[in-house]
Amino acid sequence: MHTLAAVVVLQVCWAAVLWPCPPTHSSPVDCREEQAGSSQCPTISQEKLLDRVIQHTELIYRVSEESCSMFEDMFVPFPVRLQRNQAGNTCITKDFPIPTSKNELQQISDTWLLHSVLMLVQSWIEPLVYLQTTLDRYDDVPDVLLNKTKWMSEKLISLEQGVVVLIRKMLDGAILNSSYNEYSAVQLDVQPEVLESILRDYNVLCCFKKDAHKIETILKLLKCRQIDKYNCALY
Protein backbone atom coordinates (compact mmCIF):
# COMPACT_ATOMS: atom_id res chain seq x y z
CA MET A 1 0.00 0.00 0.00
CA HIS A 2 2.85 2.38 0.77
CA THR A 3 4.33 1.80 -2.71
CA LEU A 4 0.96 2.39 -4.38
CA ALA A 5 0.40 5.58 -2.39
CA ALA A 6 3.83 6.85 -3.37
CA VAL A 7 3.09 6.17 -7.02
CA VAL A 8 -0.23 8.05 -6.82
CA VAL A 9 1.42 11.06 -5.18
CA LEU A 10 4.19 11.09 -7.78
CA GLN A 11 1.63 10.84 -10.56
CA VAL A 12 -0.28 13.84 -9.24
CA CYS A 13 2.84 15.93 -8.70
CA TRP A 14 4.31 15.07 -12.06
CA ALA A 15 1.05 15.73 -13.90
CA ALA A 16 0.90 19.17 -12.30
CA VAL A 17 4.42 19.97 -13.46
CA LEU A 18 3.46 19.17 -17.04
CA TRP A 19 0.90 21.96 -17.16
CA PRO A 20 2.89 25.16 -17.83
CA CYS A 21 -0.24 27.31 -17.49
CA PRO A 22 -3.28 26.96 -15.21
CA PRO A 23 -5.81 24.74 -17.04
CA THR A 24 -9.13 26.25 -18.00
CA HIS A 25 -10.94 23.02 -17.08
CA SER A 26 -10.65 20.54 -14.23
CA SER A 27 -7.38 18.66 -13.93
CA PRO A 28 -7.27 15.10 -15.36
CA VAL A 29 -6.13 14.02 -11.89
CA ASP A 30 -8.94 15.38 -9.74
CA CYS A 31 -8.70 14.01 -6.19
CA ARG A 32 -10.81 16.18 -3.95
CA GLU A 33 -9.83 16.54 -0.32
CA GLU A 34 -12.64 14.27 0.87
CA GLN A 35 -11.58 11.60 -1.63
CA ALA A 36 -7.88 11.68 -0.84
CA GLY A 37 -7.96 8.62 1.38
CA SER A 38 -10.30 6.61 -0.83
CA SER A 39 -9.23 3.75 -3.06
CA GLN A 40 -11.69 5.14 -5.62
CA CYS A 41 -9.58 8.27 -6.07
CA PRO A 42 -8.93 8.46 -9.82
CA THR A 43 -5.39 8.41 -11.17
CA ILE A 44 -4.01 9.17 -14.59
CA SER A 45 -4.08 6.19 -16.93
CA GLN A 46 -0.95 4.61 -18.36
CA GLU A 47 -2.00 5.65 -21.86
CA LYS A 48 -2.51 9.31 -20.92
CA LEU A 49 0.69 9.38 -18.91
CA LEU A 50 2.62 8.04 -21.89
CA ASP A 51 1.06 10.73 -24.09
CA ARG A 52 2.19 13.43 -21.67
CA VAL A 53 5.69 11.99 -21.46
CA ILE A 54 5.90 12.10 -25.26
CA GLN A 55 4.62 15.69 -25.37
CA HIS A 56 7.15 16.63 -22.72
CA THR A 57 9.95 15.01 -24.72
CA GLU A 58 8.90 16.74 -27.93
CA LEU A 59 9.16 20.12 -26.21
CA ILE A 60 12.56 19.29 -24.73
CA TYR A 61 13.88 18.20 -28.12
CA ARG A 62 12.55 21.33 -29.82
CA VAL A 63 14.18 23.61 -27.25
CA SER A 64 17.42 21.62 -27.49
CA GLU A 65 17.46 22.25 -31.25
CA GLU A 66 16.90 25.95 -30.72
CA SER A 67 19.59 26.14 -28.04
CA CYS A 68 22.17 24.27 -30.08
CA SER A 69 21.53 26.42 -33.16
CA MET A 70 21.68 29.64 -31.15
CA PHE A 71 24.94 28.68 -29.47
CA GLU A 72 26.39 27.54 -32.79
CA ASP A 73 25.53 30.78 -34.57
CA MET A 74 26.93 32.93 -31.78
CA PHE A 75 30.12 31.15 -30.76
CA VAL A 76 31.15 28.36 -33.14
CA PRO A 77 32.87 29.14 -36.46
CA PHE A 78 31.91 26.93 -39.39
CA PRO A 79 35.31 25.14 -39.62
CA VAL A 80 34.93 24.09 -35.99
CA ARG A 81 31.45 22.72 -36.67
CA LEU A 82 32.80 20.75 -39.60
CA GLN A 83 35.67 19.42 -37.51
CA ARG A 84 33.27 18.20 -34.84
CA ASN A 85 31.10 16.43 -37.39
CA GLN A 86 34.12 14.65 -38.82
CA ALA A 87 35.35 13.61 -35.37
CA GLY A 88 32.40 11.27 -34.86
CA ASN A 89 30.46 10.49 -31.70
CA THR A 90 32.12 11.96 -28.62
CA CYS A 91 28.98 12.01 -26.48
CA ILE A 92 28.99 10.83 -22.88
CA THR A 93 26.28 8.27 -23.70
CA LYS A 94 28.08 6.68 -26.66
CA ASP A 95 28.90 3.49 -24.72
CA PHE A 96 25.47 3.01 -23.19
CA PRO A 97 23.88 -0.40 -23.90
CA ILE A 98 21.09 1.20 -25.91
CA PRO A 99 20.17 0.06 -29.44
CA THR A 100 20.90 2.70 -32.05
CA SER A 101 19.07 1.36 -35.10
CA LYS A 102 15.33 0.94 -35.56
CA ASN A 103 15.79 -2.75 -36.29
CA GLU A 104 17.54 -3.21 -32.95
CA LEU A 105 14.88 -1.22 -31.13
CA GLN A 106 12.20 -3.54 -32.51
CA GLN A 107 13.82 -6.48 -30.75
CA ILE A 108 13.62 -5.20 -27.18
CA SER A 109 10.72 -5.24 -24.73
CA ASP A 110 8.52 -2.33 -23.75
CA THR A 111 10.02 -2.32 -20.29
CA TRP A 112 13.55 -2.14 -21.65
CA LEU A 113 12.53 0.69 -23.98
CA LEU A 114 11.49 2.70 -20.93
CA HIS A 115 14.59 1.58 -19.06
CA SER A 116 16.70 2.93 -21.94
CA VAL A 117 14.85 6.24 -21.78
CA LEU A 118 15.43 6.48 -18.04
CA MET A 119 19.11 5.71 -18.55
CA LEU A 120 19.47 8.56 -21.05
CA VAL A 121 17.44 11.05 -19.02
CA GLN A 122 19.35 10.43 -15.79
CA SER A 123 22.71 10.66 -17.53
CA TRP A 124 21.98 14.22 -18.70
CA ILE A 125 20.72 15.76 -15.46
CA GLU A 126 24.14 16.71 -14.06
CA PRO A 127 25.70 17.83 -17.38
CA LEU A 128 22.83 20.25 -18.01
CA VAL A 129 23.17 21.70 -14.52
CA TYR A 130 26.89 22.17 -15.07
CA LEU A 131 26.24 23.70 -18.50
CA GLN A 132 24.31 26.50 -16.83
CA THR A 133 27.30 27.34 -14.62
CA THR A 134 29.68 27.48 -17.58
CA LEU A 135 27.35 29.62 -19.69
CA ASP A 136 27.09 32.08 -16.80
CA ARG A 137 30.81 32.79 -17.27
CA TYR A 138 30.32 33.99 -20.85
CA ASP A 139 30.38 37.77 -21.27
CA ASP A 140 27.88 38.03 -24.09
CA VAL A 141 25.60 35.03 -23.81
CA PRO A 142 21.97 36.15 -24.28
CA ASP A 143 19.45 35.65 -21.51
CA VAL A 144 17.23 33.67 -23.85
CA LEU A 145 19.90 30.97 -24.19
CA LEU A 146 20.46 30.88 -20.43
CA ASN A 147 16.72 30.56 -19.90
CA LYS A 148 16.46 27.74 -22.42
CA THR A 149 19.20 25.70 -20.77
CA LYS A 150 17.64 26.25 -17.35
CA TRP A 151 14.25 25.21 -18.72
CA MET A 152 15.69 22.02 -20.23
CA SER A 153 17.40 21.14 -16.98
CA GLU A 154 14.21 21.56 -14.96
CA LYS A 155 12.01 19.71 -17.46
CA LEU A 156 14.46 16.84 -17.66
CA ILE A 157 13.97 16.19 -13.95
CA SER A 158 10.21 16.30 -14.49
CA LEU A 159 10.59 13.86 -17.38
CA GLU A 160 12.60 11.51 -15.18
CA GLN A 161 9.76 11.45 -12.64
CA GLY A 162 7.22 10.68 -15.35
CA VAL A 163 9.27 7.82 -16.78
CA VAL A 164 9.72 6.34 -13.29
CA VAL A 165 5.92 6.36 -12.83
CA LEU A 166 5.44 4.71 -16.22
CA ILE A 167 7.89 1.95 -15.37
CA ARG A 168 6.16 1.37 -12.04
CA LYS A 169 2.78 1.11 -13.74
CA MET A 170 4.08 -1.28 -16.39
CA LEU A 171 5.79 -3.43 -13.75
CA ASP A 172 2.75 -3.38 -11.42
CA GLY A 173 4.30 -1.23 -8.73
CA ALA A 174 7.90 -2.38 -9.06
CA ILE A 175 10.77 -0.18 -10.16
CA LEU A 176 14.13 -0.92 -11.69
CA ASN A 177 16.56 0.00 -8.95
CA SER A 178 19.19 1.76 -11.01
CA SER A 179 20.65 5.21 -11.40
CA TYR A 180 22.80 6.33 -14.27
CA ASN A 181 24.09 9.66 -13.05
CA GLU A 182 27.46 8.01 -12.57
CA TYR A 183 27.85 7.92 -16.35
CA SER A 184 28.12 11.69 -16.44
CA ALA A 185 31.72 12.46 -17.33
CA VAL A 186 31.68 16.19 -16.67
CA GLN A 187 34.77 17.52 -14.91
CA LEU A 188 33.57 19.99 -12.30
CA ASP A 189 36.93 20.79 -10.73
CA VAL A 190 38.68 22.53 -13.61
CA GLN A 191 38.02 25.72 -15.55
CA PRO A 192 39.13 25.22 -19.16
CA GLU A 193 40.42 27.87 -21.51
CA VAL A 194 37.85 29.91 -23.40
CA LEU A 195 38.01 27.99 -26.69
CA GLU A 196 38.07 24.64 -24.92
CA SER A 197 35.05 25.67 -22.87
CA ILE A 198 33.14 26.77 -25.97
CA LEU A 199 33.87 23.50 -27.75
CA ARG A 200 32.87 21.45 -24.73
CA ASP A 201 29.63 23.34 -24.22
CA TYR A 202 28.87 23.03 -27.92
CA ASN A 203 29.44 19.29 -27.71
CA VAL A 204 27.14 19.03 -24.69
CA LEU A 205 24.34 20.85 -26.50
CA CYS A 206 24.76 18.82 -29.69
CA CYS A 207 24.89 15.52 -27.84
CA PHE A 208 21.90 16.36 -25.70
CA LYS A 209 19.92 17.29 -28.81
CA LYS A 210 20.83 13.94 -30.35
CA ASP A 211 19.82 11.99 -27.26
CA ALA A 212 16.62 14.00 -26.83
CA HIS A 213 15.63 12.94 -30.34
CA LYS A 214 16.52 9.33 -29.48
CA ILE A 215 14.33 9.50 -26.38
CA GLU A 216 11.45 10.88 -28.44
CA THR A 217 11.85 8.10 -31.03
CA ILE A 218 11.87 5.35 -28.40
CA LEU A 219 8.79 6.72 -26.65
CA LYS A 220 6.85 7.06 -29.90
CA LEU A 221 7.74 3.47 -30.79
CA LEU A 222 6.42 2.43 -27.39
CA LYS A 223 3.22 4.38 -28.03
CA CYS A 224 2.85 2.71 -31.43
CA ARG A 225 3.14 -0.70 -29.79
CA GLN A 226 0.40 0.17 -27.32
CA ILE A 227 -1.96 1.02 -30.19
CA ASP A 228 -1.12 -1.74 -32.68
CA LYS A 229 1.86 -3.88 -31.76
CA TYR A 230 2.06 -5.70 -35.09
CA ASN A 231 2.11 -2.63 -37.34
CA CYS A 232 5.16 -0.90 -35.84
CA ALA A 233 7.82 -2.86 -37.72
CA LEU A 234 8.59 0.06 -40.02
CA TYR A 235 8.27 2.78 -37.40
Swiss-Prot record:
PANTHER family: SOMATOLACTIN ALPHA ISOFORM X1-RELATED (PTHR11417:SF3), SOMATOTROPIN,PROLACTIN (PTHR11417). It is found in: Secreted. PROSITE patterns: SOMATOTROPIN_1, SOMATOTROPIN_2. Residues 1-26 form the signal peptide. SUPFAM superfamilies: 4-helical cytokines. A smaller variant of SL is probably not glycosylated. Gene3D superfamilies: 1.20.1250.10. This is Somatolactin. It comes from Gadus morhua (Atlantic cod). One of its GO terms (cellular component) is extracellular space. One of its GO terms (molecular function) is growth hormone activity. Disulfide bonds join 31-41, 91-207, 224-232. The keyword Signal applies. Belongs to the somatotropin/prolactin family. Keywords: Disulfide bond, Glycoprotein, Hormone, Secreted, Signal. InterPro entries: 4_helix_cytokine-like_core, Somatotropin/Prolactin, Somatotropin_CS. Glycans are attached at residue 147. Its main location: secreted. The keyword Hydrolase does not apply. One of its GO terms (biological process) is animal organ development. Pituitary gland. Pfam families: Hormone_1.
